[in-house]
Regions:
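Conserved phosphate/anionic-ligand binding catalytic regions in large, soluble enzymes, centered on
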Residues: 104-114, 154-172
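Acidic, proline-/serine-/threonine-rich low-complexity intrinsically disordered repeat tracts
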Residues: 197-219
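Long, low-complexity, intrinsically disordered segments
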Residues: 211, 216-233
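Conserved, well-ordered active-site substructure
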Residues: 88-97, 169-187
């Protein structure tokens, strides 16, 4: 049974990984090659993953730890490499002020302090763009307008994105998000017909009769002030 009674357990990602796998990533913090080898040593598939300390830590958590978080748990201190919009932790520059909530082995929410340093943000966007160029479809793209806005200034801020649909899945005991999502994306049954209609639409439009613009007669329209019954004009 899942106990949602406060307060929920709080643990850093690195400590959660060490508790489950025995791998101590903090002992080799910042050493990219050693982190990748440590992840592989506990059975983590690192194929296609950037050879960075933070990516190795996150992949180990994602593949080995997340499914074990049955009781409500806050995972804190996410690596910079997987948190492109989150502010760095003042306690450790390799980590960020970010946490995620997990229940029944599923992420229920993501929250962090917003990064408001334009120089740091630009560097992270560049790193994300390189990941995207190498095939990472989840990586962010460069956003020069956002960086420019940060240069003008943004006060300290933060936010939480909560997975309402996932919470509904847990409370309803369903196995698929499609059972609870309000507006599921569905393939139209007449998708083939729709394509054929779209192809023939230009030809049909060319043959259609010209549209006659109907003129509206405003000659009898009377414009009156608002509240004329309450105000002496």
């Amino acid at each position: 049974d899942v106990d949602l009674t406060p307060s929920w357990k709080r643990i850093t990602m690195a400590d959660a990984v060490q508790n489950v796998t025995g791998a101590d990533f903090m002992a080799i913090e910042g050493d990219d090659d050693a982190a990748v080898e440590l992840a592989k040593s506990v059975g983590v598939d690192m194929e296609g993953v950037a050879r960075k300390w933070g990516n190795a830590l996150y992949e180990t958590f994602d593949q080995k730890v997340e499914e074990t978080l049955i009781q409500p748990t806050f995972i804190t201190m996410y690596p910079v490499e997987v948190s492109p919009l989150a502010k760095r932790s003042p306690e450790d520059p390799h980590l960020t002020e970010r946490y995620e909530m997990f229940v029944c082995g599923c992420e229920m929410g993501n929250a962090f302090s917003e990064l408001n340093d334009p120089i740091d943000q630009h560097q992270r966007f560049k790193a994300q763009a390189e990941k995207r160029a190498n095939g990472d479809e989840e990586a962010d793209m460069m956003d020069e307008d956002f960086v420019l806005a940060l240069e003008y200034g943004m006060p300290p801020t933060g936010g939480l994105g909560f997975g309402i649909d996932r919470c509904a899945m847990m409370l309803c005991g369903t196995d698929s998000i499609r059972d609870v999502i309000l507006f599921p994306t569905m393939k139209p049954l007449d998708s083939d017909k729709k394509v054929s209609k779209e192809v023939s639409a230009p030809a049909e439009a060319a043959q259609a009769a010209p549209v006659v613009e109907e003129k509206i007669d405003f000659s009898n329209v009377q414009i009156e002030p608002l509240f004329q019954n309450q105000v002496d004009f």
